[in-house]
Amino acid sequence: MKLIGITGMPGSGKSAITKLAEKYKITVVSMGDVVRHETSKQGLILNPENVGNTAVKLRELHGKEAIAIPCLNYVNEKYNCEDFVIIEGIRSIYEVNYLKKHAKLDIIAIHSSPKTRFDRLSGRNREDDSNDWNTFVERDERELNFSIGNVIALSDYMVVNEGNYNDFIHDLENTLKNIIKAD
């Protein structure tokens, strides 16, 4: 199994990989979907506080790689060992280490400034996003407490998403092509 991990702070542009993945016929598994599913399963409203608290509780109960385990189990059940699979939303170095024990893994970090990310999240209208700056900052702090900063700093590739969307997609696609070609 060849995994491509996508990391970045909320609103950085991680989900853009989904459109490229379709083009290259690569499956995307979202770690955030695992957390949102668990939040809903508990009967909680999908909002930044509940989703964030669920992520924290899952890691407290099942270890710091708690979100990576069901993602990898799903991938192993559904896909051929020769397939590329993208794991979107890696947040901790523990998740990276867990995935690397079980598969070849390259990490792409997507970076955007806090202001750019806040503007995007404010307009995205997803249940677990907020248009309140203080809630945004709290979410960033929670993400940083998961050690996402370490994952970003130690990533294999970095794509900056500050300007034109088409330029970002072009850079992201070139990075994806380089990973596929290197294999």
Swiss-Prot record:
Record-level Gene Ontology MF annotations: ATP binding
Gene3D superfamilies recorded: P-loop containing nucleotide triphosphate hydrolases
Keyword entries, A-Z: ATP-binding, Nucleotide-binding
InterPro entries assigned: NTP_hydrolase-rel, P-loop_NTPase
Binding site for ATP: 8-15
UniProt record similarity statement: Belongs to the UPF0200 family.
Protein name from the UniProt record: UPF0200 protein MmarC7_0527
Species this protein is from: Methanococcus maripaludis (strain C7 / ATCC BAA-1331)
